[in-house]
């Protein structure tokens, strides 16, 4: 294969474009013939022993390559409107005459540089004008009056930015005046997209100015353009619920403008002033943009408003796309009942509304959340019955539904292994069909395989999948990175590490059992797939040690098979710390005594300034919480450090029955709200020198709210330093919530630790008085309290303290809906000791409880 290197060089003659083609072709012919002659001579001299000569077929093949190259070059010149020296345009390449072949190069070299430069400039300019005519109308280009802005923001259509163009038009003299509104609006609607909010306002103002404020002339294309740009916006972080959202308000203002136009049109008709040539109409696309933005705001009220408005006032009912958007909104809001109702409505409305594969994929995602594998299997059968073509995501979602359903023996109906096996078979079917894969499908496919492997407790495969995916993503980012890779390691790792992948890997560690065999090892296709990933993992581990260009390393133990609990705990700690410290680019979880003292000194001064500047305790508390959040973002990878991954990480030592390690992890990575408030209050009173209203109890724990005056004693100074260090350590801690309290109670049940059970009972009681708990929905509070009470009953049952378990049930029978499944273990234990009286009391509570009474009791408690 022969390659030609192209590019600008110094001290090289410059020729007009067509002549350059003539000489380059002649030069290529000469070089090609010379190459063939040279190769022929070499072959004749060096391959006599091999009896190898160049055949006519080889020559013909190489000539065909040359002809293809020449034709390609001709095509490029044909498509470029080059200007010749006589000022005539030519759209084709003239035949090469004999005179042209014998051009004297020395004469050409004497052509003035100015003429050559002019020819090249004319060529570039004509090409620019041709492309610009396809992007913007001529009148728009004239009023922008800056070709640099147009070229910079519009030439790359994949990253076009219309905001500078619209803003430049806004400050121009004529704006959109004296432009035919119909043709212009058609171009506008199909071209101008993804404007920021201020540019949308400018565009709307110019369009109104173009039609002299006559809203009747504000046509459908104009409405669709404005609504399309509004629908593509993202809500601000501080206004996720859509309350008084400026975009929603603008949408409603546009609808009011449309209503006004209809009213004016009707009045003109009644007065016989003439019927307008074309009345604007609302469309399904406009409704969809309204719904799209409403779902981004998670605003059910606004979504319902737009649906009702379009249906009642404009006669536009939601179509398939609108209803799919509504279902996706319900899915994000965990409103599964409403999603199923809407889905059923789509199936029975009409054939035009019948769900497509996008809608079915959304419903499969809901099945995953509900762990409802029977419904998922029914949906997949419906897809096949209605001849709907499944996508890659359909098979992936089926695998994920089956994986999540296999996590619980009750949900899986005792067939966890069978569900995981079926999930793998869906992925095998996906591989056999070789369907189109979107860029995001690779991630979803890895997540599905990680889910199946993690719930199966297959640590080897989970490690391999995690390593291969993270390595691929890291190296891809480095290969395309425009900055300094070594300097930007923090940013690269933040983009590489993923919380979902980490959570599944931690889940695999938590389900470790050396006695279990992976389901993939039970059939030939599964064995081949598993071996393939393990081989790639092993070879990648070895190659990455010698890769000097892109250094990549994950803190896995240098062994292929983890076979002990100590190894699992060690590796899970290493991977967890590696993720939190953002690929090892930060040093947050470990610090020397000197560094700790420096932090205490630094934050002592900072907290002192907060206390002096704050008007009251609440402002001081807000400043401290803001500083803690800022400190956490600077020192921890907050993308992977969340309550879900922490819950899975803490469950590892529970399942492995390692009590000491569980308590260490719990203490190091969590804090409690009431402890935090006590420390904050102590610091505030100490800095402000406020006398305490409470005397310090010698037997009280350090977390009790006490006042600190001037630190005159060593004990007071140590307490101040302890509190400051407590605040400093919050950068790697997450506040305990109801879910984590439930996990601690499960740990107390597993370890049979009565002291831990009493402590978590008291701590949760204090948590119930804090603002985070009181802000929860009333029904959620009841459900969380009931679940914790159920865990307490399980603890006392396992301890053999049946009277205490029954006491909890009786004391809460008016609040909770006690079902038999919640007291099954207690009932069996009472039957074994033949305590008929307690059994009768227990069954009476289970059979006569009313949930309505529980809500009424909760309401009375809140009133009190």
UniProtKB/Swiss-Prot annotation:
Q: Which UniProt keywords apply?
A: Mitochondrion, mRNA processing, mRNA splicing, Repeat, Transit peptide
Where are this protein's PPR repeats? 319-353, 356-390
Q: Which GO terms describe its cellular component?
A: mitochondrion
Transit peptide extent on chain: 1-76
Q: Which InterPro entries match?
A: Pentatricopeptide_rpt, TPR-like_helical_dom_sf
GO biological process, any: mRNA processing
NCBIfam families documented for this protein:
PPR
Q: Which family does it belong to?
A: Belongs to the CCM1 family.
Q: What is the designated name of this protein?
A: Mitochondrial 15S rRNA processing factor CCM1
Q: Which gene encodes it?
A: CCM1
